[in-house]
Amino acid sequence: MKSNNILDIETENINKNSLDIDKKSTSEIIKIINNEDIKVAYAIKKELNQISNVIDLIFERFKKGGRLIYIGSGTSGRLGILDASEMYPTYGIDQNRIIGIIAGGNKAIKNPIEGAEDNEKLAIVDLNKIKLNSFDTVIGIASSGKTPYVLSALKYANKKDALSIGLCMVKNSEMTKIANQVISIKTGAEIITGSTRMKAGTATKLVCNMITTTLMIKLGKVYKNLMIDLVATNDKLKNRAFKIVKQLTSAKDQIIYKALAESNFSCKHAIVMILRKISYNESVLLLENCDNSLTKLLEEKV
């Protein structure tokens, strides 16, 4: 067994606020948990400038065709997969543009795979499977900042001239010696000692939300605060698409239904078709001339 002093890091410390949690009532337990969770957003707030810098770096590569790749083990890997999997239905982004990889493969999503997080070679194999290239960004997620699988992924990203980003929950981690940029959120000791699926996991999810949501906004996938590139794969989303078009055009229902049907339920194109009184094909050309940004088209009167 290799030792990387995992027990010396902040996320493994004893939380003095939950020392007697096993003796508390249900209401007392959840108050302790809630009080600790509140601290997560404040910890992230301290790193907003760095998160912003990282997003701008990712965006520059992404708009040139690069991909965003989350990679991690255990909870960290699962959270990356969760965030990546939401991008297609919410924003209509190609499913191969934002990818989540977990140590041990798909089986590890539900069940722990023994030794996967310590396997440095496995990270290289996994990144080779997706043909990592210099336009890509690799975000290695590890609460401790020390997971061998994740550190290996960041090293390999450097070798391939991809952008390497570390996301961890401690300061001055091993990631700072490897990654091009590191986002370090100091979440501190967990309520249950070492259970980083809790505060560390919450912080990871919030940061991933920030990264991908901001990226999608900058790519023109949002108008005002509406998801105009959603993929209407069920009745709920079709109703949402109708509501979005209605809100932005105030058109009669039959006109909206017709535009959505002709545009394969593309809110963005249906909106342009109605407001400019043009065909679907014409709306495609018009949006292409505006970098597919409805904001540019409507606000700049193109």
UniProtKB/Swiss-Prot annotation:
Which family, according to the similarity comment?
Answer: Belongs to the GCKR-like family. MurNAc-6-P etherase subfamily.
Q: What else is known?
A: A lyase-type mechanism (elimination/hydration) is suggested for the cleavage of the lactyl ether bond of MurNAc 6-phosphate, with the formation of an alpha,beta-unsaturated aldehyde intermediate with (E)-stereochemistry, followed by the syn addition of water to give product.
Might you give the EC number(s) for this enzyme?
4.2.1.126
State the UniProt keywords alphabetically: Carbohydrate metabolism, Lyase
Pfam family for this entry, one: GKRP_SIS_N
Quote the pathway field: Amino-sugar metabolism; N-acetylmuramate degradation
Q: Which GO terms describe its biological process?
A: amino sugar catabolic process; N-acetylmuramic acid catabolic process; peptidoglycan turnover
Instruction: Please indicate if the UniProt record lists Lyase as a keyword.
Output: yes
Name the SUPFAM superfamilies on file.
Answer: SIS domain (SSF53697)
The record's subunit annotation is: Homodimer.
Q: What is this protein called?
A: N-acetylmuramic acid 6-phosphate etherase
Residue span, SIS domain: 58-221
Q: Which organism is it from?
A: Mycoplasma mycoides subsp. mycoides SC (strain CCUG 32753 / NCTC 10114 / PG1)
Known catalytic reactions: N-acetyl-D-muramate 6-phosphate + H2O = N-acetyl-D-glucosamine 6-phosphate + (R)-lactate
Indicate the residues that form the catalytic site.
86, 117
One GO term in the molecular function aspect is:
ether hydrolase activity
Q: Which NCBIfam families match?
A: N-acetylmuramic acid 6-phosphate etherase, PRK05441.1, PRK12570.1
The gene behind this protein is murQ
Q: Which PROSITE patterns is this protein grouped with? A: GCKR (PS01272), SIS (PS51464)
Briefly, what is this protein's role? Specifically catalyzes the cleavage of the D-lactyl ether substituent of MurNAc 6-phosphate, producing GlcNAc 6-phosphate and D-lactate.
